[in-house]
From Swiss-Prot:
Record lineage: Archaea, Methanobacteriati, Methanobacteriota, Methanomada group, Methanococci
Family classification: Belongs to the adenylosuccinate synthetase family.
HAMAP family assigned: Adenylosucc_synth (MF_00011)
GO biological process, alphabetically ordered: 'de novo' AMP biosynthetic process; IMP metabolic process
Organism: Methanocaldococcus jannaschii (strain ATCC 43067 / DSM 2661 / JAL-1 / JCM 10045 / NBRC 100440)
UniProt xrefs under PROSITE patterns: ADENYLOSUCCIN_SYN_1
Annotated substrate binding sites: 258-264
Gene3D superfamilies, A to Z: Adenylosuccinate Synthetase, subunit A, domain 1, Adenylosuccinate Synthetase, subunit A, domain 2, Adenylosuccinate Synthetase, subunit A, domain 3
Cofactor comment: Binds 1 Mg(2+) ion per subunit.
One Gene Ontology term of the molecular function aspect: GTP binding
Protein name, per record: Adenylosuccinate synthetase
UniProtKB keywords: Cytoplasm, GTP-binding, Ligase, Magnesium, Metal-binding, Nucleotide-binding, Purine biosynthesis
Subcellular location: Cytoplasm
Any single Gene Ontology cellular-component annotation: cytoplasm
Binding site for IMP: 19-22, 46-49, 133, 147, 185, 200, 262
């Protein structure tokens, strides 16, 4: 009889237009669940993540955001585009976290070259109408489709990091180890399901992130979709619940993109889009960030029963509309400012 192995694979997905606070949630889960591998899916260095540790902020674009947990291998899946310059700078920046010794870059990763970045920034349609980050991902993906894109195995500077991420991840799952897969950007930026044409250059849902790191759908145990109480968006495109900059400032919400430095547009929570995002990703759980911005009384609260009634009603409505439990709640930027209800499922 075939032995049944308990699945221990979790995918983290953004449920809006990116910048939902996935970095904070990933850091928290890594600290609590202690995965053996943290694997990054997604497009490439067009998405930035901010990780706050002990009052210090790290803005990263290539290395998995779970890097503070030093016991895990850090993997970049074959579906991810790699900018060697950005990657090597981050390896150096994060040397205190032993990133160099833990990093595995799949040898099949596509490579972004300078020509791709130049094309991205000079293309009037992409730069002005769509609002691209200028990181070269779109043009590089074009070359990938044409089968002329270089791969990581062709780049001398990456030789020491090369490996087979699919094998690493599947072997870890076969051993019953925890594996965390990081998605980037957000569901509503998906090339297929987002606000086309104001989208990124590939799909950004859970199924694509699984494919990016080389695992099949039956290996996935949990899909945690991350929402923030006041969604934001960088660049052009529809934003049904958008508020004015003045309204955002009155709420104390002034944010800038990690990659572009552009001011983020801010809106009110869209329950219907949240429902759709949960469906598209097959969400099993929801992580909610920025509850302290929704209600300042919730700042730093670590127990659910100490939240305000206003906050509880908001959480209950999210669960009712989406049909998915809210299990992780962030009440501040630091890792310990978190309510974890996963054991109550």
């Amino acid at each position: 009889m075939k032995k049944v192995v308990l699945l221990t694979c979790t995918i983290i997905v953004g449920g809006q237009w990116g910048d939902e606070g996935k970095g904070k949630i990933i850091s928290y889960i890594c600290d609590k669940d202690k995965p053996s591998i943290i694997a990054r899916g997604g497009v490439g260095p067009n998405a930035g993540h901010t990780v706050n540790i002990g009052g210090k902020s790290y803005g990263i674009r290539m290395i998995p955001t779970g890097f503070p947990y030093k016991e895990a291998k850090l993997a970049i899946g074959a579906g991810v585009l790699v900018d060697p310059e950005v990657l090597l700078k981050e390896v150096e920046m994060l040397k205190d976290f032993n990133v160099k010794e833990r990093l595995i870059v799949d040898y099949r990763c596509g490579i972004i070259e300078e020509k791709h970045k130049i094309m991205d920034r000079k293309d009037e349609h992409l730069a002005k109408e769509i609002g691209t980050t200028g990181s070269g991902c779109g043009p590089a993906n074009v070359d990938r489709v044409l089968r002329i894109l270089k791969q990581a195995k062709d780049i001398e500077e990456l030789k020491e990091f090369l490996g087979d991420v699919s094998e690493e991840v599947n072997n870890a799952l076969d051993r019953g180890e925890n594996v965390l897969i990081e998605g980037t950007q957000g569901t509503l930026l998906s090339l297929y399901y987002g606000t086309y044409p104001y989208v990124t250059s590939k799909d950004t849902t859970a199924s694509s992130f699984a494919a990016d790191v080389g695992i099949g759908p039956t290996k996935v145990d949990e899909v945690i979709v991350v929402f923030k109480t006041f969604p934001t968006r960088v660049g052009a495109g529809p934003f049904p619940t958008e508020m004015s900059l003045e309204e955002a400032e009155s709420l104390g919400i002034v944010e800038y993109g990690t990659v572009t430095g552009r001011r983020r547009r801010v809106g009110y929570f869209d329950f219907e889009l949240a429902r759709k995002a949960c469906r598209l990703n097959g969400a099993t759980q929801i992580a909610l960030t920025g509850l302290d911005k929704y209600d300042k009384e919730c700042y730093g609260v670590t127990e659910y029963n100490k939240l305000s009634e206003k906050a509880k009603e908001f959480i209950n409505k999210i669960e009712e509309v989406t049909g998915v439990p809210v299990t992780i709640i962030s009440t501040g930027p630091e890792m310990h400012q978190t309510i974890d209800l996963r054991n109550e499922l």
